[in-house]
Amino acid sequence: MQRFAAKRSVQNISVSLWRRCISSTSQAATASVKDSDEFQARLPPFAYTPPPYTGPSADVILSKRKEFLSPSMFCLYRKPLNIVDGKMQYLFDESGRRYLDAFAGIAVVNCGHCHPDVVEPVINQIKRLQHPTVLYLNHAIADFSEALASKLPGDLKVVFFTNSGTEANELALMMAKLYTGCQDIVAVRNGYHGNAAATMGATGQSMWKFNVVQNSVHHALNPDPYRGVFGSDGEKYAKDLQDLIQYGTTGHIAGFICEAIQGVGGIVELAPGYLSAAYDTVKKAGGLFIADEVQSGFARTGNFWGFEAHNVVPDIVTMAKGIGNGFPLGAVVTTPEIAGVLTRRSYFNTFGGNSVSTTAGLAVLNVIEKEKLQENAAMVGSYLKEKLTQLKEKHEIIGDVRGRGLMLGVELVSDRKLKTPATAETLHIMDQMKELGVLIGKGGYFGNVFRITPPLCFTKDDADFLVEAMDYSMSKM
């Protein structure tokens, strides 16, 4: 197999380089798929044809974005896509071309795009009442909070609604500090928790951290079985956490926030045994365990919650993304005792618990149960992971295949022994796969990990097509 000879420094990656890696492909690695007609696989049949698109072209939209929207916004792919329609696990561009969506709006559209059993109740609600404020009674927020609490273990029964994962994590961190009377928060390197003040502090990647005050956050070693200093030894990483608390704090902390699988960080599974050992350490230090389920929640990993695979029960659970299938919705769920801290002052969120969003949330829970999407995520995810692992044996550029359910990562390296990030090659393969009709995400500190987080209605036929497109694209490097 071809071994990619390019060597890149893995000590650091500048923000400007990282942004270029996200939004465009380098000249050296960029090429159109001139021979895509050689690709024999075809998208699985799908009984939906979108109506003709009559809106502005991609060029017009791109021009408006550049003129009127923040320069911090960027697009995937060398030639940005104008997506105008979606149905279940497929997206359609302005020409009507169908794409297999293996990114789901960044792990958001768990039920599938425009799922009729989500759309219909939302339309009915929005026709009747859009936003009454939670200062009045309305059944939508009450019904959803009851259903959501039933999905969580133990005394995790009190729900606070927000509009995003960042908001949810900000609230959780504040509650932990109020409840314990401590200020120190412990997080994990390479984790991502949001882009506001406290969550930016908890995030463990420099490219997401602006030069603003970020107090009292300590970052433990990342328990990454592939790149971590202790490999798969969860106990050694847990000992590092213990030492960090003992020597870097007063010995007492407010809380520990952690993803069950790191999403933005590159679909990194935690080393076996780490989270349960970390839980014990945190409790001994008087802290609360905050489970960040923004990406791994709502059946994506084959468990309903990612933390369930680690045999721990958190004190606070945060969620967003898949909770609303695309509607702006997030939540914090905790115990009645911890929830009581917010009665010390006035706490309010204008749009948190909006009747349309919570109607969507309840519909999502119903669809997941009715269509057995959790079981499908486990079954199809296991099948896809096996296929990707087989692909690793064929292509030297694949350094690691990881994840659970339909939250999978494929890390690309130019040298397996040195684990040199194949960042440019990752972009090139993504672009080729797009030309073949497959959309995937990317992440990881070096931008060299494919993030495969499709809608949970993804089928084995879809998985086969994705793998064939990836195989073909890699073979053309």
UniProtKB/Swiss-Prot annotation:
TM stretches of this protein: none
Record's keyword annotation contains Transit peptide: yes
Highest taxon listed in the record's lineage: Eukaryota
Binding-site list for pyridoxal 5'-phosphate: 165-166, 192, 292-295, 350
Subcellular location: Mitochondrion
Residues where N6-(pyridoxal phosphate)lysine is found: 321
Gene Ontology terms describing biological process: photorespiration
Reactions catalysed according to its record: glyoxylate + L-alanine = glycine + pyruvate
GO MF terms, alphabetically ordered: alanine-glyoxylate transaminase activity; pyridoxal phosphate binding
PROSITE patterns: AA_TRANSFER_CLASS_3
Cofactors (names): pyridoxal 5'-phosphate
EC number(s) recorded for this UniProt protein: 2.6.1.44
Principal location listed in the UniProt entry: mitochondrion
Transit peptide start and end: 1-22
Record keywords: Aminotransferase, Mitochondrion, Photorespiration, Pyridoxal phosphate, Transferase, Transit peptide
Subunit-level organization: Homotetramer. Interacts with GRF3.
Family per similarity comment: Belongs to the class-III pyridoxal-phosphate-dependent aminotransferase family.
Protein's name in the database: Alanine--glyoxylate aminotransferase 2 homolog 2, mitochondrial
